[in-house]
């Protein structure tokens, strides 16, 4: 059953929230994202152009496992370039990179390095 804006079980959920959630799931189907990275992509003028509130709603409700996303991102990096373990962690948690938390970046890099 599709989520309806008028549904009493989802009071306060806007059409923008629903559309942002659909786009978040689409993005996650082909690329790894951190929570902050996904919000940034969704609210970017070059991405989804959703409001920060809509983008945040989508990231909170998309069902992503952020540790698993960090592993996926780490493996993506290792498939195209060489990194030290610490360099990979830095790339994953960088404000200019993937924006994972330090814990998520460390988890992802260590799992990908195995």
Where are these regions (language model features)?
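An alpha-helical, amphipathic repeat domain used for nucleic-acid recognition
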Residues: 8-114
